[in-house]
Amino acid sequence: MSFIDEVKIHVKSGDGGAGCVSFRREKFIPLGGPDGGDGGKGGNVIVEASPNLSTLLDLRQHPHQKAGRGRNGMGKDRHGAYGADLKMLLPVGTVIKDAETDEVLVDLNEPGMSVVLLKGGRGGQGNARFASSTNKAPKFAQPGEPGEERWLRLELKLMADVGLLGMPSVGKSSLISKISAARPKIADYHFTTLKPNLGVVAYKNYKSFVMADIPGLIEGAHEGAGLGHRFLKHLERTGQLIHILDISWMPDRDPLREYEAINRELALFNPELAEKKQIIVINKIDLPVVKENLATVLPYFEERGLKVFPISAATGEGIPALLDEIARNLWGQAEEEW
């Protein structure tokens, strides 16, 4: 798949430089004392959340990352230069885990957030440090400390205000294409969307929100069926969910059973997902068969206190009312003018 949302990499901070063994050798000072300088500190590994990145593709292509080594100390009390830090710019929303223990090390959930992930090794002390009244000419120095290293797994979770949820081919891609600048691949067959698509939706009075078109889910998704649980995690950070249903296939397909099946998958993957607010959308209201079937499914949702918004992603019918509802949930109220 072209969207890289998970990658395993090896990172290493810089080794410290070695201390120097050196003695003053100057004219008229035949027995000069020790003047070996310290080694430089190794570079740190730093991770920073960048709002300008959206994938982990670069790290997939370069899975081994290493900070600079500290330079060795030199004579005349000259210390080695510090190793260059390795600054890894990552998309906002990247979660960094230890690849072996699965421990979460860093959650880069804010733009500009910067964390020192691995510290560089300390530089070794030169022999000038070890001169004493009992040993005025030490002939030894410290080696530099090795840097830290570990295998990491990076996961990128989409930072979206609204997530589009539903079985394959119910019209999620068509809706996000209609109301945002996103242009996902659209066709009338399952799993057209093979990656999460983000779209920025412009609302009234210059307000906007981010919508995520999540690939279609099927029963067993929490166990990896279909496109698998790798996409369920993209829903975890969305503030609200739009659950899109296609009732044009009744009675061959039961949209209410599909609705329950998807919510079951959410609960099995993460119980908190099933508790997120959902807006129920009936797509393709421009089709006569959908208008006929609408009366059959409405009581189901009315009994559960859920609002239903019939729309057409093809013609735009019903979309203004849907966006007003999203705005009410995001900001507490909808704007008066569309």
UniProtKB/Swiss-Prot annotation:
Listed binding positions for Mg(2+) are S173, T193
Keywords attached to this entry? Cytoplasm, GTP-binding, Hydrolase, Magnesium, Metal-binding, Nucleotide-binding
Chief location of this protein within or outside the cell: cytoplasm
Of the GO CC terms on this record, one is: cytoplasm
For the ligand (GTP), the binding residues are 166-173, 191-195, 213-216, 283-286, 312-314
| Obg domain sequence ranges | 1-159
Query: Recorded GO terms, molecular function?
Result: GTP binding; GTPase activity; magnesium ion binding
Q: What class of enzyme is it?
A: hydrolase
Domain of life here? Bacteria
Q: Which prosthetic group or cofactor does it need?
A: Mg(2+)
Q: What Pfam families has UniProt attached to this entry?
A: GTP1_OBG (PF01018), MMR_HSR1 (PF01926)
**GO BP, one example?**
ribosome biogenesis
Q: Where is the OBG-type G domain?
A: 160-331
InterPro entries the UniProt entry points to? G_OBG (IPR031167), GTP-bd (IPR006073), GTP-bd_Obg/CgtA (IPR014100), GTP1-OBG_CS (IPR006074), GTP1_OBG_dom (IPR006169), GTP1_OBG_dom_sf (IPR036726), OBG_GTPase (IPR045086), P-loop_NTPase (IPR027417)
Q: So what EC number does this one have? A: 3.6.5.-
Where does it live in the cell?
Cytoplasm
Function, as annotated: An essential GTPase which binds GTP, GDP and possibly (p)ppGpp with moderate affinity, with high nucleotide exchange rates and a fairly low GTP hydrolysis rate. Plays a role in control of the cell cycle, stress response, ribosome biogenesis and in those bacteria that undergo differentiation, in morphogenesis control.
Q: Which family does it belong to?
A: Belongs to the TRAFAC class OBG-HflX-like GTPase superfamily. OBG GTPase family.
The annotated subunit structure for this chain is: Monomer.
Q: Which PANTHER family match?
A: DEVELOPMENTALLY REGULATED GTP-BINDING PROTEIN-RELATED (PTHR11702), MITOCHONDRIAL RIBOSOME-ASSOCIATED GTPASE 2 (PTHR11702:SF31)
- Its recorded name reads GTPase Obg
Q: Gene symbol? A: obg
